[in-house]
A protein has these predicted regions:
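Short, surface-exposed linear patches
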Residues: 19-21, 32-33, 40-41, 68-70, ...
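Short, non-transmembrane alpha-helical segments in secretory-pathway proteins
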Residues: 24-49
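Exposed beta-strand-loop-beta-strand "reactive/processing" segments of non-cytosolic proteins
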Residues: 1-9, 51-75, 82
């Protein structure tokens, strides 16, 4: 917990950093990410959870969407590209 921001850090067995996951408010998602969701086949789904993921190889937003009992997780980069 960093003030009001919750972060999870992942390290390998040798203690080297591998990943940071930062929980986000839905309102903190960039416009490009929101536009990608609205333009996708999941446009009618509700955003349930959002995280910002940082790794050695890249960064992306992990967005969990729900519609009834259906659930999907999308990886979206800062430009709005669904990975």
């Amino acid at each position: 917990m960093d003030g009001t921001v919750c972060r999870e850090l992942l390290f390998d067995d040798g203690g080297a950093w591998m990943q940071t996951k930062t929980e986000l408010r839905i309102t903190a998602l960039p416009d490009a990410v929101m536009a990608a969701i609205k333009a996708s086949q999941y446009a009618t789904y509700r955003i349930d959870d959002a995280d910002f993921i940082e790794t050695l190889t890249g960064e992306w937003y992990l967005v969990e969407l729900e519609s009834g009992k259906q659930e999907v997780k999308l990886r979206i980069d800062a430009t709005g590209k669904i990975l």
